[in-house]
């Protein structure tokens, strides 16, 4: 790649849907082409002469970018003596958050909770070997949060995944998206930091709208019937924010 400066544009194309489990939990699922496939691209340009320099599949890069943001937040905001992490969610982003926490703090124990028992057990086995720390699968979100120095929620849930009163003094909290966090938690934080809110500005219509899914910067379009199935606009808690959010 030629010397900079550079300008990067990320484009992601998804078919989104919102299944509801038997116990009433609502999540957001996405795919491109067919379930299980993904399409995300980063296009890199030279700002010196405008030439396109690269087109990169962002399947791995996107996880690393978001994880790096979480790591930077923990480096500057988590207590220096932080040793324990509570993780809600067992997917790729949950793994991506835990790794940088281990890089910036001497993490020795992680408690992981996912509603899917098989997934949380697999997460615990994999990450304990990868990071050489104790990773313990627990049976409830409450147990995952109790007593930890760093709390990380990285889920596809459309509703809060923990209660505000669970947040303890001195706890550092990282959230992947605004819907995971209860509004009342804002009152328990001493400081809130978020990544930039810049996004593409486009005219919205009844069939083309923003802020309707987990990503506050994404636009969703569809037929009138399809738009009826789309979630309501994202809530606007006192601190707002893009993902991830740190406190």
Feature map (PLM): residue ranges:
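Short acidic low-complexity segments
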Residues: 133-148, 164
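Glycine-rich Rossmann-fold phosphate-binding loop(s) that bind the pyrophosphate
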Residues: 89-91
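Alpha-helix C-terminal capping/helix-to-coil transition sites in glycosyltransferase folds
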Residues: 146-147, 168-169, 188
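Short helix-loop-beta connector
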Residues: 77-84, 106, 168-169
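NAD(P)-binding Rossmann-fold cofactor-contacting core
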Residues: 103-131
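Rossmann-fold NAD(P) dinucleotide-binding segment
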Residues: 150, 157-172
